[in-house]
Amino acid sequence: FAKRYVELVIVA
């Protein structure tokens, strides 16, 4: 689940 969060943070 960390990978999904990391991707969201990068997009943010």
Swiss-Prot record:
Keyword field: Calcium, Disulfide bond, Hemostasis impairing toxin, Hydrolase, Metal-binding, Metalloprotease, Protease, Secreted, Toxin, Zinc
UniProt binding sites for Ca(2+): E7
Cofactor note: Binds 1 zinc ion per subunit.
Posttranslational mods: Contains 3 disulfide bonds.
Expression across tissues: Expressed by the venom gland.
GO annotation (BP), single: proteolysis
Span of domain Peptidase M12B: 4-12
GO cellular component: extracellular region
Top class in the EC scheme: hydrolase
MF term (GO), any: toxin activity
Domain of life of the organism encoding this protein: Eukaryota
Note: The molecular weight was determined to be 21,390 Da.
Family assignment from sequence similarity: Belongs to the venom metalloproteinase (M12B) family. P-I subfamily.
Protein name: Snake venom metalloproteinase
Species per Swiss-Prot/TrEMBL record: Crotalus molossus nigrescens
